[in-house]
């Protein structure tokens, strides 16, 4: 029981930091094309994250490899960063 409590206590900050890094990555790498609110920008006809039907795993692949007008981020982001930003987007772009 004590081990479970310890594991849960240690996991909470990791989950929080992953969410925070997703927020930071989104605002530094994604928002210039997809908008601060993730709705996309009409000028570029960039897809909205809010209506995306992609699963988190599919989104990770798009971030990794790129698609249509979106560049690949495989050389700019680590796999952990890609997972963090995809999870952040799929969570609805929370501010905290």
Give names to the regions the model predicted.
Residues 9-25, 37, 58, 96:
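Electrostatic cytochrome c docking/interface patches
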Residues 32:
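Short, cysteine/histidine-rich loop/knuckle motifs that typically chelate Zn2+
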Residues 57-78:
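Short Fe-S-cluster ligation motifs
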Residues 1-4:
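Positively charged n-region of N-terminal signal peptides that target proteins for export
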Residues 75-96:
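C-terminal capping alpha-helices of c-type cytochrome domains
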Residues 23-27, 35-64:
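Gly/Gly-Pro-rich "capping" loops immediately C-terminal to redox-active cysteine motifs
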Residues 20, 53, 76-80:
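Soluble non-cytosolic domains of exported or imported proteins
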